[in-house]
Amino acid sequence: MSYLSVGDEVLIRGELGIVRFAGSTDFESGIWLGVELLNGKGKNDGSVKGKRYFSCEKGKGIFVRACSSNVMKRPSVVKSRKKGSENISNFMEKTKAIKQKSRREPSKFERSLARPLCITPIDSSTPTKTATFYTSSTTENLDELNFSTEELSSFDTTLLNSDTSKLSGLDDSSFMEEEFVWQVDNVLQECEKKFTPHSKGSYLKENLKSELRKGRLDELMCENTALKEKIDKLNKELEKVEPQLTFLRSKNSIEKPRNFRREKFLKKFLAMQKEIKYLRKRKLQIRKIPNYKYSDRSLNSKTPKSQDNWTTQVTPSSLLGVSEVSKVLQLKQVQVDITELVKIPKNPFSEKLTISNVNRYLNIVPGSLDLQFSLTNENFVHWNSTVYQELLNLKSNNSSVDGVKTRRQLLEENALLSHKVLKLTEEIQDLETLNQLNTEIEARQSEKLNEVQEETQRLSQLLISSQPALTEVKHLKLCLSDSQEELLQLNAKLEKANIVIDELNSAKLKLSKQVEEESSMKDDLTEMNQRLKEQIESYENEVNSEITSRTLKEFETLKTQYEKNLCNLREQLKTARMKLADKYPQGDNTSENIDWLKHSLRDSNTENSIPSPLTFACKEIRKLVADIKPVSVEKQLALNWKKDIERPSFHHNQQLFNYCQLTDILSKKC
């Protein structure tokens, strides 16, 4: 496919791909296309037998012949709505014009093809009316005929090829449409989401298919109009060529009277040649007569007086010579008339001997030559009879009267005869030149007749061979008329589809406006959220900064108080220990003391049994736990201590242990 190039999107057996290479390869002859498949169902990565033609991922490249029917160019979608309506109006106008043309009468070209070609046979025996000669313009007409026949044959071949391609394109149109629908499926799905009914989606698919068919049919109709314009041009050319064909048909009738005239002319020419031969023989016979001796010197040496004596001594026989001289003068006048009519130079080969010149000469001569040759023939016969009578008279005079004829009389007769012979020789030369011209004309005309016959045969064969093509053209016209009706129906459907598409487009515009409004609302909400977050963060930062400053101050004050209280507690503990040691002196047996403490704590209430410094310390610890805010080990211990104190069944030994542990930690920090 010559219309594919690198970068085009292609469908190969229903799979989408991109052309990456186009040209000849080393692995096989011909033009190949290297295609990168998008689905990845190929055979290579753009290289074959170690040579790389293009680069792609492995398993996505494939090579396909450019002329294969599996490769199809991906069609383009017409998005503009206005262009579609304009195309429909143009298409309707074209279909109306095509219908009007198809309903017209058959052209002259069809009539000439329907009419059989009549070729008249050449018959030299039956003469016909005279016509104009075949001039040099016929060669130009024949060239035009050959050119027109070649155009007809080429036009027939182009018609057949274009029709087959159109039919194949129409067959493949449905395949193209089914492959192209997948491009629109995404748009249809979005529309179906917005316009929930399923019927609208299917209707849109049908509309898209009809749009595809419409674009395909637009191309076909444009091609059809171009072909019809070519047919009209060829019809006009055939109308121009028809007079030339009639001329060629009448050429046979033109040549018949020519042949008849030539035969008549040749007969006259042969008769004149016989007369000339006879005159030559008579001249020889006259020279053989006795006392027929003279010399040029004697003639040149004659004086005017002797000439006067010669003129005075006129005999009856010399009168006969005068009559002969008058006849010779008549013959000379006839010859002059013939040369004026024919207008051929004495040396015809000095000029260019062309068919046009000869035809001009022969067009002038035909009527007058017959009359002049008849006159010359009669004059020659009369002159021959007179010469014969004069010879008889001369013989009788020679026998009867001795010495009557002098040498001068014989010289006069000889001079007259020689003058006649010279004139006759000139006429013979002219006739020979005419004969040569006629022979050349006959040869050329025979050649042209053969050429014309061959061309007529070729034309008849071409007409016979073009008849099946014409029948096919008529059949295609019928098919086109059917397709035009289908196109009209499709146009009606397309108009309805355009109305529905307009409604859908209006709905799409409304939805797009709503979506834009929603998107603007979302943007406003996001901006508000961001502002609130920023305000909250700023407020939290301010609050945290205030809280931290307050807590630090309070912690410092509490710390100082706690340190004071700790010092007091230490002193009180020391005194309490001393008192306990004094009050309960039981040696170093601590386990017994602990058991005793447990027993005493169980039996008595906590507040009454615990000594006063201990209760004071518990209260202080509770206050500290309530005031301390930052999380630390001290806070955790204080919380545990608070929980233990709040329990009703709390053992004092554990309470004391926790208290001691807390005091140790605080003492270490202090």
Swiss-Prot record:
Q: What does this protein do?
A: Binds to nuclear microtubules with the effect of either modifying their structure or function. This then promotes meiotic nuclear division.
List modified residues, type Phosphoserine: S460
Gene Ontology CC: cell cortex of cell tip; cell tip; cortical microtubule plus-end; cytoplasmic microtubule; dynactin complex; meiotic spindle pole body; microtubule associated complex; microtubule cytoskeleton
Q: Where does the record place the modification Phosphothreonine? A: T606
Q: Which residues form the CAP-Gly domain?
A: 23-65
Task: Please tell me the species this chain comes from.
Answer: Schizosaccharomyces pombe (strain 972 / ATCC 24843) (Fission yeast)
This chain belongs to the protein called Microtubule-associated protein ssm4
Q: Name one Pfam family in it.
A: CAP_GLY
Q: Where in the cell is it found?
A: Cytoplasm, Cytoskeleton, Spindle
Q: What is its main location?
A: cytoplasm
Q: Which PANTHER family match?
A: DYNACTIN 1-RELATED MICROTUBULE-BINDING
Q: Which GO terms describe its biological process?
A: dynein-driven meiotic oscillatory nuclear movement; meiosis I; nuclear migration involved in conjugation with cellular fusion
The protein's UniProt keywords, in alphabetical order, are: Coiled coil, Cytoplasm, Cytoskeleton, Meiosis, Microtubule, Phosphoprotein
Source species, domain of life? Eukaryota
Q: What does the record list as coiled-coil region(s)?
A: 209-254, 404-582
